């Protein structure tokens, strides 16, 4: 388990909702003051969290049907070369290959202020779209409430996951994430099969 995975597993302890997790992540996203030093580790932790969402939350896992999912540093060299991606990450935080071999590029953006709108320049969204040009779908996954219209209108193959999506993640999904991080088998919730007459 990496250091970030270990930290995230600890943060997920006794967490049942995004509302409970968000303040814990914010502690890893601070400016330099008299009592704190600057850290942006929350961004990396949010990337790991996003990966877990695509693996274990039904809204994401069913829609995107992940065959393979990689943090940028985990992308195999041959796939990186096929997509003409640089060795250093410049905006793509996750890469998903679905069961139809479609490539989904994901950028993750964590904000302490969830009411803020993601900005094209300040949040460097252009880097993501520039380096992810060979992807079939472009996703921005953020806890912010909105995104600039420029990003929304850039391509038809775009999806923005916002604060409202995070609010819908179930307590059972948070438990699956924590369980997966600590290396225990994840229990799948089976839906009852309706009888023929139902």
What is each model feature region?
Residues 3-5, 14-18, 77-80, 129-198:
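ATP-dependent helicase/translocase motor core
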